[in-house]
Amino acid sequence: MIFSKSLAVGVFVVACATPLCAQQGQQLTRPKVEGKVIFGSAVFGEDLEHTLVGGAVRAYVTKRLSIEPEYLYLRRSKDDQDHLVQMNVAYDFTDPTKRFVAYAIGGAGVLHNRGRVSGSDFVTRAPFVREISFTTWTVSAGGGVKIFLTDRLFVSPELRLGREPTVRATINVGYVFGGRR
């Protein structure tokens, strides 16, 4: 909860301190390559909330269609940590040269979990700790809005639903490396 509030305050400060757009008369081109850092929260099932951090690179294949491989590190506690690698496809609903760009995104990938389970034996009541590790598939779909703070720097809140995790809410901070000039 504190992480989410700190993140919101940080994004607000950046938005207020950064000039919003360059000169209005300047013609922008569509983005070609973007990189972003991802911060947020994910929920597995009904109550297993994880904090997440990661990164992604988006490459445009047409004016509005792009592919985006991403990596996320998710952590609930020292006894529950996940690594997620997913290939996404994104579509910009609005003109990608504008200040606000609404998009849909979805993809599939793999999630690897490592953790520890502790308890006591049912019969002997002897305590035990077991290391666990498993890999499973993941899929998610959702949408977001890129808000350009400058010609190239943007923030984008994003919400996704899926399998492993069930719900994912993130704030992305990104930069356009090719295009928008």
What are the roles of these predicted feature ranges?
Residues M1-T29, G179-R181:
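Cleavable N-terminal export/targeting peptides
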Residues A22-V61, I67, Y73, A108, ...:
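Short glycine/proline- and aromatic-enriched beta-strand/turn motifs that initiate or cap beta-hairpins
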Residues Q24-Q27, D121-A126:
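Gram-negative and organellar
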Residues L28-R30, E46-H50, K78-L84, I132-T138, ...:
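Transmembrane beta-barrel outer-membrane domains
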Residues V33, K63-P69, T97-R99, I147-V155, ...:
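Repeated loop/turn-to-beta-strand initiation elements of outer-membrane beta-barrel proteins
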Residues G40-V43, L74-R76, A126-E131, E158-L159:
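Extracellular loop and loop/strand-boundary signature of outer-membrane beta-barrel proteins
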Residues V43-D47, T51, P96, R116, ...:
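Subset of outer-membrane beta-barrel
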Residues R58-V123, T136, R163, N172-V173, ...:
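Gram-negative (and chloroplast) outer-membrane scaffold detector with strong preference
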